[in-house]
UniProtKB/Swiss-Prot annotation:
Similarity annotation: Belongs to the protein kinase superfamily. CAMK Ser/Thr protein kinase family. SNF1 subfamily.
Keywords: ATP-binding, Kinase, Manganese, Nucleotide-binding, Phosphoprotein, Serine/threonine-protein kinase, Transferase
PANTHER family, A to Z: CALCIUM/CALMODULIN-DEPENDENT PROTEIN KINASE KINASE-RELATED, CBL-INTERACTING SERINE_THREONINE-PROTEIN KINASE 20
UniProt protein name: CBL-interacting serine/threonine-protein kinase 20
Origin species: Arabidopsis thaliana (Mouse-ear cress)
Pfam families: NAF (PF03822), Pkinase (PF00069)
Occurrences of domain Protein kinase (ranges): 12-266
Catalytic activity: L-seryl-[protein] + ATP = O-phospho-L-seryl-[protein] + ADP + H(+); L-threonyl-[protein] + ATP = O-phospho-L-threonyl-[protein] + ADP + H(+)
Domain text: The activation loop within the kinase domain is the target of phosphorylation/activation by upstream protein kinases. The PPI motif mediates the interaction with the ABI (abscisic acid-insensitive) phosphatases.
Amino acid sequence: MDKNGIVLMRKYELGRLLGQGTFAKVYHARNIKTGESVAIKVIDKQKVAKVGLIDQIKREISVMRLVRHPHVVFLHEVMASKTKIYFAMEYVKGGELFDKVSKGKLKENIARKYFQQLIGAIDYCHSRGVYHRDLKPENLLLDENGDLKISDFGLSALRESKQQDGLLHTTCGTPAYVAPEVIGKKGYDGAKADVWSCGVVLYVLLAGFLPFHEQNLVEMYRKITKGEFKCPNWFPPEVKKLLSRILDPNPNSRIKIEKIMENSWFQKGFKKIETPKSPESHQIDSLISDVHAAFSVKPMSYNAFDLISSLSQGFDLSGLFEKEERSESKFTTKKDAKEIVSKFEEIATSSERFNLTKSDVGVKMEDKREGRKGHLAIDVEIFEVTNSFHMVEFKKSGGDTMEYKQFCDRELRPSLKDIVWKWQGNNNNSNNEKIEVIH
């Protein structure tokens, strides 16, 4: 549908579509009062809820308000309706850095400038307890002045996401840019993992291609974990030396960001940016109680985020998702769709109780026997998040609720344990872990 002419929240006139993904569309828009151009990210609540991405959206909001830096895309405000969430963000006109690199390698001074801006911004993020975890040229935008802006904080982690060992434990990021310790699925330091990704970005800017690139993913992972890469002969000696320290597969001996910033090659023409002073913690705390109420009282037009200039730890954004389903019947799995369907077929056959039919979105199980309120029927929907990561939701579509709950508790859920990665919802996850999706 053409959005031109639509006025959002009596404030923004939507223009052309800039891009879209599975769960969101981004439009160019104009602030009616000021005439300022912005980018409006429109997120479908139902779609993100169905695949368990609510926490990821909340995290993106939290991080974008927590981080204020000239080289990070600025979030003006967040608005919500019953079905959509709207991010009004800084409009970055120059497009993706990826588009620039796809045309070939950059000149050394240009590559250094982007790397300086990237490292400066990431250093600031780390000082705020934020780790990006998906740094790549596609997530680095350029403004009209040719300056870099970091975007897409959907996978980022806040300091409180660390477990008792002080490390992060969720595999995130794009394979070719991800650090070896992240691939190893052991605990990792988010700051050190970001440094590795920055090194891959620097290599790509100067070479025009990736340091680790194989058609075979296993072979690529092997090279990453061993730190096996070669620099082209046009790389300056000081860059080769710097990259050897950044792309060190041992995170403990890998160069730290402050040492990168002291490097002589990095220092050429580098101007450190003074960042705005963050509000005092007591100023934030005094406003937190008002924010959730603002969304529940007047979600259509009240901009809750004008109340605060930064978010504190533990802030609850559940008001954005007024009808979030706290279902006991969702789980994530690393099995493919065929294996998931096969498991439900096995359950139906072994119980000798259900007929099973396949549909475009999953399967339907129907009890051969008639219960208190007719035949018990269960719809199973399978949602692909990535090729190797699925969300499965099953729910009663007919019959008695008590019979459904008894069947789920005694037969269905125990039978699914060998394909379930994580159950969704507070009642199903004893560790109360957040589910983060691998891209």
